[in-house]
Design a protein with these regions (language model features):
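Cyclophilin-like peptidyl-prolyl cis-trans isomerases
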Residues: 1-257
Length: 257
């Protein structure tokens, strides 16, 4: 009887030790767990693959927006419509004209077919973002309405939608003024190959002084962009009503629409 009791006591002790070990490991795992940043894979027709690590800790709105658009197929078939050597390559315009972007319906099924924008996540707009604009940095493109009025600074800062650009060279002038949200981790050679395609002056500006020569003659096409989130749901971005520059202009000059 004594022997049986001893065996039962030993089994109970082992069970307690195992339980403590399991619970302890669980707490250790939780304490040391670090989530893996999402990684976007972009396929560019006739060029190759570009992989970009995204940083939700720096620009959560931009990252959530990008993930939804990419994984819903919005970027498939878009083009690198603006290419400036020793500066950046830009894509994400719905019609490839640099003027059009995504709609709310591109973010989710059942969304309205309306334009939208997101908050600019950078220091000048009151958001801490420490990503520097160096070779390979990925950032949201936005409008600059301050050329029309200095009062439109905030409207400019919060005008990003779907267009983004990849830096091909460091440019510190952009630090704190544009929402950087990622970095190329593979395929920087592909980025430079795109950067080096033949370009021409923007349509309508051919004979204009200081016209930007940035429109590719043979436009590089994005086949697809998909983002691996490693099981983490980054949710929906908080969308804003975009600034209607045309209506503002009419109002400024008292012109009826």
């Amino acid at each position: 009887m004594k022997k049986v009791g001893k065996i039962i006591w030993m089994v109970a002790l082992i069970a307690i030790i195992v339980l403590i070990g399991v619970v302890g490991f669980g707490y250790y795992k939780k304490a040391t767990f670090t989530s893996q940043n999402p990684v976007a894979t972009m396929e560019v027709e006739n060029f190759g693959t570009i992989k970009m690590e995204l940083y939700p800790d720096q620009a959560p709105e931009a990252v959530a927006n990008f993930i939804k658009l990419a994984n819903n197929g919005f970027y498939d078939g878009t083009t690198f419509h603006r290419i400036v050597k020793d500066f950046m390559i830009q894509t994400g315009s719905k019609d490839g004209d640099g003027k059009t972007g995504a709609k709310l319906s591109n973010l989710k099924d059942g969304g309205e077919n309306k334009d939208y924008s997101i908050k600019g996540e950078f220091l000048a707009n009151g958001v801490t973002n420490t990503i520097k604009f160096e070779e390979g940095t990925v950032a949201m493109a936005r409008a600059d309405y301050t050329q029309y009025s200095s009062n439109l600074k905030e409207k400019s800062y919060n005008s990003a939608c779907s267009q983004f650009f990849i830096m091909t060279k460091e440019n510190t002038n952009l630090n704190g003024y544009y929402a950087a949200f990622g970095k190329v981790i593979e395929g920087m050679d592909i980025v430079h190959n795109i950067e080096n395609v033949e370009v021409k002056a923007t349509e309508g500006q051919e004979n204009t002084e200081n016209a930007e020569v940035s429109t590719p003659v043979n436009v590089p096409k994005v086949t697809s962009i998909r983002v691996e989130t490693f099981g983490i749901d980054y949710g929906m971005p908080n969308t804003l009503t975009p600034f209607d520059y045309t209506s503002w202009l009419y109002k400024q000059y008292g012109i009826g629409q």
